[in-house]
Regions:
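Conserved G1/Walker A P-loop phosphate-binding module
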Residues: 1-81
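Conserved C-terminal guanine-recognition region of P-loop GTPase G domains, centered on the G4
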Residues: 51, 75-143, 216-218
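P-loop NTP-binding site
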Residues: 184-293
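Canonical P-loop GTPase G-domain recognition
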Residues: 113, 122-180
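Active-site phosphate-binding and catalytic loops of NTP-dependent enzymes
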Residues: 30-32, 99, 171-175, 198-209
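Active-site glycine-centered loops adjacent to acidic/histidine catalytic or metal-binding residues
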Residues: 58, 119, 149
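Catalytic P-loop NTPase motifs of RecA-like helicase/translocase cores
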Residues: 39, 62-64, 96-97, 124-125, ...
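Conserved glycine(s) of the Walker
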Residues: 16, 155, 246
Length: 293
């Protein structure tokens, strides 16, 4: 008998959802940084064996939207509650259980199995952990609570074991050689954006969108032209930096990661353009692939 199903990872920003996703799938599918709101899209990572297929989905952190981009991010998160066979609700030892009560209330009424994962336990102590477990039991009495550390991979194997046990019998949903639902260009976008998140401060990383305008691949190399969009001229200057040094650093670091990701020589050219207030434009958000409905 073959098992298959959709396992969706949800939770607040910066609790370690993307790190967990990568640990479960065994591939670096989602970018992960120390900054909140790193993930903007719903990203599938597909784990295959001969008799099983697990379709994991990493989702943006739950937040109160302040502009249309964040509305789209919240849509990705809430839609993950409607099509899961198993839900992984990720919290951590820092945030309080009463954060985003409305979303937790939706999770509490779900009829599918819910694994509540308390992440980053390597940063806490036993007494604090016991308090959190009791608080979450009161909020989500039907959930199975598992303390984990996605970074050190503590209990990640146990989470995978429980997921496998909870999956329904089903034929596979995707070809067995497929490991994600995203095209190659998407990962180029994400890797470049990850470097911007790491190397720039304040609002700059959140005002950026990356678009691959050219992706030409042959047996040994890939030529990539990527445009970094910002909202204002002042942001363009900051991204480029003095004598272009800041942008060069981003491109150099991104190229190294892309070569590891694709296993080929990468020729990467980056450009910076202004798209005024794109985060609040329905048209531009749709052009960039965001879900608005």
């Amino acid at each position: 008998m073959h098992k298959a199903g959709f396992v969706n990872i949800v939770g607040n920003p910066n609790v370690g959802k993307s790190t967990l996703m990568n640990a479960l799938v065994g591939e670096r599918i989602s970018i992960a940084t120390f900054k909140a709101q790193t993930t903007r899209h719903r990203i599938m990572g597909i784990y295959n064996t001969d008799d099983m297929q697990i379709v994991f989905s990493d989702t943006p952190g739950v937040l109160k939207p302040q502009y249309k981009l964040q509305e789209s991010m919240l849509n990705f998160s809430t839609s993950a509650l409607t099509d899961a066979d198993v839900l992984l609700y990720v919290t951590d030892v820092v945030e309080t259980p009463d954060k985003h009560n409305e979303f937790v209330e939706k999770v509490a009424h779900m009829e599918i199995p819910v694994l509540l994962l308390i992440n980053k336990i390597d940063l806490s102590n036993q007494e604090k952990l016991v308090e959190l477990v009791e608080a979450w039991k009161a909020l989500l009495p039907n959930a199975e609570i598992i303390p984990i550390s996605a970074t050190t991979k503590f209990n990640v194997d146990y989470v995978m074991k429980r997921v496998k046990e909870l999956l329904p019998d089903s034929p596979p949903y995707f070809d067995k050689d497929q490991w994600t639902d995203k095209p190659a260009r998407f990962f180029v976008n994400e890797i470049i954006r990850e470097k911007i998140l790491l190397y720039y401060d304040k609002e700059i990383p959140y005002s950026v969108e990356v678009v691959v305008e050219q992706f030409k691949e042959d047996a040994k190399k890939i030529h990539i032209n990527a445009v970094i969009y910002v909202e204002r001229d002042s942001q363009k200057g900051i991204i480029i930096g003095k004598q272009g040094k800041a942008l060069k650093k981003v491109a150099t670091e991104a190229r190294r990661d892309l070569e590891r990701f694709f296993g080929k020589t990468i020729f990467l050219e980056t450009f910076v353009k202004v798209d005024k207030d794109w985060r609040s434009s329905d048209k531009e958000l749709r052009n960039f692939g965001y879900q608005l409905d």
